[in-house]
Amino acid sequence: MSSHHTTFPFDPERRVRSTLKKVFGFDSFKTPLQESATMAVVKGNKDVFVCMPTGAGKSLCYQLPALLAKGITIVVSPLIALIQDQVDHLLTLKVRVSSLNSKLSAQERKELLADLEREKPQTKILYITPEMAASSSFQPTLNSLVSRHLLSYLVVDEAHCVSQWGHDFRPDYLRLGALRSRLGHAPCVALTATATPQVQEDVFAALHLKKPVAIFKTPCFRANLFYDVQFKELISDPYGNLKDFCLKALGQEADKGLSGCGIVYCRTREACEQLAIELSCRGVNAKAYHAGLKASERTLVQNDWMEEKVPVIVATISFGMGVDKANVRFVAHWNIAKSMAGYYQESGRAGRDGKPSWCRLYYSRNDRDQVSFLIRKEVAKLQEKRGNKASDKATIMAFDALVTFCEELGCRHAAIAKYFGDALPACAKGCDHCQNPTAVRRRLEALERSSSWSKTCIGPSQGNGFDPELYEGGRKGYGDFSRYDEGSGGSGDEGRDEAHKREWNLFYQKQMQLRKGKDPKIEEFVPPDENCPLKEASSRRIPRLTVKAREHCLRLLEEALSSNRQSTRTADEADLRAKAVELEHETFRNAKVANLYKASVLKKVADIHRASKDGQPYDMGGSAKSCSAQAEPPEPNEYDIPPASHVYSLKPKRVGAGFPKGSCPFQTATELMETTRIREQAPQPERGGEHEPPSRPCGLLDEDGSEPLPGPRGEVPGGSAHYGGPSPEKKAKSSSGGSSLAKGRASKKQQLLATAAHKDSQSIARFFCRRVESPALLASAPEAEGACPSCEGVQGPPMAPEKYTGEEDGAGGHSPAPPQTEECLRERPSTCPPRDQGTPEVQPTPAKDTWKGKRPRSQQENPESQPQKRPRPSAKPSVVAEVKGSVSASEQGTLNPTAQDPFQLSAPGVSLKEAANVVVKCLTPFYKEGKFASKELFKGFARHLSHLLTQKTSPGRSVKEEAQNLIRHFFHGRARCESEADWHGLCGPQR
């Protein structure tokens, strides 16, 4: 402690007065108590406790000694705003002061810490918050100052925050006791404006102040402050009353003009806004100040008030701490405060210059009940977390003391002094009670009468039995027209209505202004980086889809493809990134909305994971290969996968009737027999080979002619068609084809003719196959190999039907149309292979070579423009209609891979929709009984069974009987369906 004495000369008092005059500009101290406290801190041989009212000069008690000391003084203050006010004030006095808080920039923080590490720091006073004092980042700096003996004082401002019995308890203040113990050689100074005896003892204990403590305490009585209480329930116009109070306190009533300023405290932000509007409308310029405003707006409002551009500021309790404004003429509380100490501290911000000032509290029992409820709720919440404590009652007791201050008769100054343990002061008419006790008593009695909760019954309030609070005075026919007896009878109600209307308009305009400021911000598009792997990364065709989201989806696809390669152990050396980029770009081009884009990416990822789970490599042929294949034909978007309605038309023609552009034309007997011979001699090409035709095959074979390879859910390697789940394009086209098929369903006579055509004796291909050895026919075979061009655009010139020889006419027995029979359809795979069967010998040849030597026949360019015509009443065209129906029914890819018999195509009269409805009704009881392991298996089996029923129907049985028969056969000896493999061996009904 002696080190502090060596700092000062032999006459420290003279040095103190010199600094007071030179730095702070005062000739003398404000009070003798302030001088005594300052000298005690300068001596430094005791810890000091200072309790002075707001504006009494507490800050000078430690600021002046800090300038005289050798080292640095650390000041702990609860609010950054309070710290900033103190720093700004000292900077104007050219004092080296700094603040270490979270709002400093990195450069400012670096410069401050560097100064503190110097041998002789230039900073004399360092302000910090209690959170900063306890932080680990500040400990090295603190230890450095302590080890070099550069810490002169530890000052704790607003020390009442240490006590749990105080009105503003902060848990972080409790950690300052440990900090004080580490700084044993440095004196500690604790300062507060409000301290009851209980709070004072808590401060001594929590901060570990060394006894004996030098206590300097000023009585809380301030003679220049006039306290009064107004009851809102008794005031007809509270806003007008507040306006009159403001003008009177500011001096306008004496025709001196407005002098000074005032503060009005409200409990909520909404009340601040509303009250500021009401005062402004009534002629008192006022602005709101609360935490809901932006920092720049709060600063502007505070500066306007400090410069007295705005005389009245309407604020929450956060305003005023550390504000050095001496000429505050009044402080009004629009709502009751939460404690007596809080009210005293806030009201004490008036009259710091010693001139008469006014403090008014607008009391309402409604406000009292609301605040009491909130306080008790906070206490209950704390008790749930940490249990009951004796200090929990302190908050409620502090609020009850303020309620007693308002509702009981007595001197206001005496009530405040009693609460803080001071001697009763000599008020000398310094409050409303001492000035006019009779008026205060009458107001309290009126408050008791007006309080509705205190009444036990409803009765007339006047002696004549008329109660103005009740309808028509409480009696029928009494006082009905009494209001018209006076000349100004109705003007009061009209005035109140106008005032209410004006208030509502102001409130409405304010709410509209608040909503206008909350318009949604427009999201700015962030351009991609230079190394962005995405295609069309800078495209903004999909709104609200960011480049970051696309890159995330690309990573998902790349990870899924990588896991697929690892699970299948394939030796594919292709770049996974390139594949993922192609998949992502394809999804991006197909989607129009961000949500649909993300859903499509997730679906692709799920498909890849499903393929990995089944042990099969994910094939991108359905997307990437089709794109490369579509680059060659001249019309890539024209019926890539033609539906049945376009492949088979009911338009009657002699030969090849109804084939659309791009489908397989009529084959002559020569071509048919040659292709049959080639099929019998040549080995069957391997399915799923690596080589693939560069273009799609005929629309018929792409839909039905190709035999699906075994695999999960009937997937075809290299293709995009799935068993029971066609692509969306195919679904759309099938639906359009199905509608035209339903309209063109064959009649009963045509169905009988189609049934007769199934007989082997009626098959015209039977006669063609016996003429294989004809050398003339063999010579024309090479030209017939390419007779089936791709459906994607290799079109031959218009052809004319070729005349048959007499032998061919006689074999048929009718006008010939052999290409539409089932045998001819079964011959087509050899001349027009599906896309997954790649053989070099059957590549399509140009149309001019294919049709060499044949007479052209008429064929329309656009099949969609052909009108649907009714078939001729002949046998063969009816067979064509039946073939068309069978292809449409089997369009989902459910043909049996090994079936080559004449019963391959579906029977007439059974649509897929009818079969599906019957199957679902029959299968539902089994699903409810738990016969299926999952709902997906139930749906898959129903789909499979529906296709079986459309393919075959036994004579004499209905679809329902066939479905029930197949279901009984399936569950015979099987308790439950566990996987899709269970129904792979299930065959359709037999004739």
UniProtKB/Swiss-Prot annotation:
Keywords: ATP-binding, Cell cycle, Cell division, Cytoplasm, DNA damage, DNA repair, DNA replication, DNA-binding, Helicase, Hydrolase, Isomerase, Metal-binding, Nucleotide-binding, Nucleus, Phosphoprotein, Zinc. Residues 438-609 are annotated as: Plays an important role in affinity and substrate choice in DNA binding. Changing K598E: Abolishes interaction with POLR2A. Residues 613-645, 681-761, 780-901 are annotated as: Disordered. Phosphorylated by CDK1 at Ser-727; this phosphorylation is required for RECQL5-mediated disruption of RAD51 filaments on stalled replication forks. Residues 490-620 are annotated as: Interaction with POLR2A. Zn(2+) binds at C411, C427, C431, C434. The modification Phosphothreonine is found at T839. GO terms for biological process: cell division; cellular response to camptothecin; cellular response to xenobiotic stimulus; chromosome separation; DNA metabolic process; DNA repair; DNA replication; double-strand break repair via homologous recombination. Residues 39-213 form the Helicase ATP-binding domain. A motif (DEAH box) lies at residues 157-160. Changing R352G: Loss of helicase activity (in a residue 11-526 fragment). DNA helicase that plays an important role in DNA replication, transcription and repair. Probably unwinds DNA in a 3'-5' direction. Binds to the RNA polymerase II subunit POLR2A during transcription elongation and suppresses transcription-associated genomic instability. Also associates with POLR1A and enforces the stability of ribosomal DNA arrays. Plays an important role in mitotic chromosome separation after cross-over events and cell cycle progress. Monomer. Interacts with TOP2A, TOP3A and TOP3B. Isoform beta interacts with RNA polymerase II subunit POLR2A. Identified in a complex with the RNA polymerase II core bound to DNA. Interacts (via C-terminus) with POLR1A. Isoform beta interacts with RAD51. Interacts with WRN; this interaction stimulates WRN helicase activity on DNA fork duplexes. Interacts with MUS1; this interaction promotes MUS81-dependent mitotic DNA synthesis. The alpha-helix immediately C-terminal to the Zn(2+)-binding site (residues 438-453, characterized in C-terminally truncated contructs) is required for helicase activity, is positively charged, and may play a role in DNA-binding and choice of substrates. NCBIfam families: recQ_fam (TIGR00614). This is ATP-dependent DNA helicase Q5.
